[in-house]
């Protein structure tokens, strides 16, 4: 596929045209043509793999919630959604940036590829270290407000576990993302479709496992008071090294200067989802909350990240920052246009929506097979769960269309500014809607049991 771009520049003095310049560029690189079937196949398999990974992460969380450290340090449960969401934000924005670079041919040159990869990885490490610490602080603040306890030993444990988890997970998943994007480019597959969900298939599991292991290790060595502060300071001390590496790529340095607000705000949004999780996970009417939360949050986040990355790539290929194509001039498009038109981004939105119900049914069935009676499996709950999953994705896909247009109009990169907000909102929506499903199911079953009891009492002869 050959991409041809014509750039015109007019120079005026007053109202008179004094000169102009014309630049024609042709590039053999670009997005390969995709049919609905090819898009569905490319997206479906990675989404299923990511769902299995998130399901495994849910099973892990269902197990570790009973560990002594999670019972004693309640704020660890509040930390899970923002920390998992942070991992998702960093890896999804990294995947989206690398996919855009791959589709525009920027990483085909070996020297340029090394510069782009090293600087992107360094930026992710800086963001992971700093925001990992901020996530722990946010969890502590929310926990202090709710149960008014403050223990310096637990503060140090929480901060150190969060920083190490964010650092190691970002490093491992960043390397994985790089391999996936380069491999996808070589095999002629659109990285936008597969990079994010494949990384997510291991991301949640890796993040939760590292958090559980690190927090348990420091909890078992809590008598050595200097251990946690020393380790935390050591990881923070590596930050200048990552900044030095990132400086080799000036466009990436802009992310370090201006890309903090989306990541931090997304972390704060996810923290409220974590607060909901910590308040509901131990109550009997929310049985199964721990195992289903990573699935519903992860599926919604992955689907909206894929759509955002595709729209961003489309704009990078066919427009310039600050200028929206004719068919995308409206900031608040009609929802029918977003989901029902023949435009390429609308087609991909329909494909992603089509995957929601079958995907959730498969994951729910597998969870019930593994967990058995520990997960509510009534018909009412399954219906409510599917409705919640569909509602979450519809809202996120529409907001993705709106936010990408707004950020592009402001000459901002949607890869860096949209995905964090949307995945953070996806975590909050997913956790809230899932808790509502459990609550409605409990109320409806309670009413049905009450009606059955009343009918039995009425039918008993005096």
From Swiss-Prot:
Superkingdom to which the source organism belongs: Eukaryota
GO MF assignments: magnesium:sodium antiporter activity
Record GO cellular component, one term: plasma membrane
Transmembrane regions listed in the UniProt entry: 41-61, 121-141, 163-183, 194-214, 225-245, 258-278, 351-371, 380-400, 424-444
Disulfide bonds: none
Keywords: Ion transport, Magnesium, Membrane, Mitochondrion, Mitochondrion inner membrane, Transmembrane, Transmembrane helix, Transport
GO biological process: mitochondrial magnesium ion transmembrane transport
One Pfam family it belongs to: MgtE
Coarse class of the protein's main subcellular location: mitochondrion
Subcellular location: Mitochondrion inner membrane
Catalytic activity annotation: Mg(2+)(in) + 2 Na(+)(out) = Mg(2+)(out) + 2 Na(+)(in)
Membrane topology value: Multi-pass membrane protein
InterPro entries tied to this protein: SLC41_membr_dom, SLC41_membr_dom_sf, SLC41A1-3
UniProt record similarity statement: Belongs to the SLC41A transporter family.
Task of the protein: Na(+)/Mg(2+) ion exchanger that acts as a predominant Mg(2+) efflux system at the mitochondrial inner membrane.
Protein name: Solute carrier family 41 member 3
Taxonomic source organism: Rattus norvegicus
């Amino acid at each position: 596929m050959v991409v041809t771009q014509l750039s015109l520049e007019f120079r005026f003095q007053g109202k008179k045209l004094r000169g102009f310049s014309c630049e024609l560029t042709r590039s053999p690189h670009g997005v390969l043509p995709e049919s609905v079937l090819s898009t569905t196949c490319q997206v479906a398999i990675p989404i299923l793999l990511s769902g299995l990974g998130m399901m495994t992460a849910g099973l892990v969380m269902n197990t570790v919630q009973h560990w002594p450290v999670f019972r004693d340090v309640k704020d660890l449960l509040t930390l899970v959604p923002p920390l998992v969401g942070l991992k998702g934000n960093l890896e999804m924005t990294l995947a989206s940036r690398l996919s855009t670079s791959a589709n525009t041919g920027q990483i085909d040159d070996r020297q340029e590829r090394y510069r782009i990869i090293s600087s992107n990885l360094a930026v992710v490490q800086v963001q992971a270290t700093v925001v990992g610490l901020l996530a722990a602080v946010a969890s502590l603040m929310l926990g202090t407000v709710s149960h008014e306890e403050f223990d310096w030993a637990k503060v140090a444990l929480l901060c150190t576990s969060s920083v190490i988890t964010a650092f190691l997970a970002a490093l491992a998943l960043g390397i994985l993302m790089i391999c996936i994007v380069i491999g996808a480019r070589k095999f002629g597959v659109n990285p936008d479709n597969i990079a994010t969900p494949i990384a997510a298939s291991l991301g949640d599991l890796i993040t939760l496992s590292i958090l559980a292991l690190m927090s348990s290790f420091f909890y078992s060595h809590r008598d050595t008071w200097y251990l946690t502060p020393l380790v935390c300071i050591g990881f923070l001390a590596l930050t200048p090294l990552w900044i030095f590496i990132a400086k080799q790529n000036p466009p990436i340095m802009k992310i370090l200067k201006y890309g903090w607000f989306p990541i931090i705000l997304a972390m704060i949004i996810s923290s409220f989802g974590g607060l909901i999780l910590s308040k509901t996970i131990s109550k009997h009417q929310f049985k199964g909350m721990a195992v289903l939360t990573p699935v519903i949050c992860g599926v919604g986040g992955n689907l909206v990240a894929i759509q955002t990355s595709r729209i961003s790539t489309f704009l990078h290929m066919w427009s310039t920052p600050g200028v929206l194509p004719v068919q995308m001039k409206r900031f608040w498009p009609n929802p029918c246009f977003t989901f029902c038109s023949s435009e390429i981004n609308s087609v991909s939105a329909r494909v992603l929506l089509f995957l929601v119900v079958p995907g959730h049914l498969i994951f729910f069935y597998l969870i019930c097979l593994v967990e058995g009676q520990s997960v509510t499996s009534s018909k009412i709950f399954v219906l409510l769960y599917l409705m919640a999953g569909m509602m979450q994705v519809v809202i996120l896909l529409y907001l993705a269309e709106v936010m990408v247009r707004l950020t592009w109009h402001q000459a901002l990169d949607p890869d860096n500014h949209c995905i964090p907000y949307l995945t953070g909102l996806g975590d909050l929506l997913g956790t809230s809607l899932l808790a509502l499903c459990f609550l409605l199911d409990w109320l409806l079953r309670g009413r049905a049991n009450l009606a059955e009891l009343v009918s039995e009492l009425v039918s008993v002869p005096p």
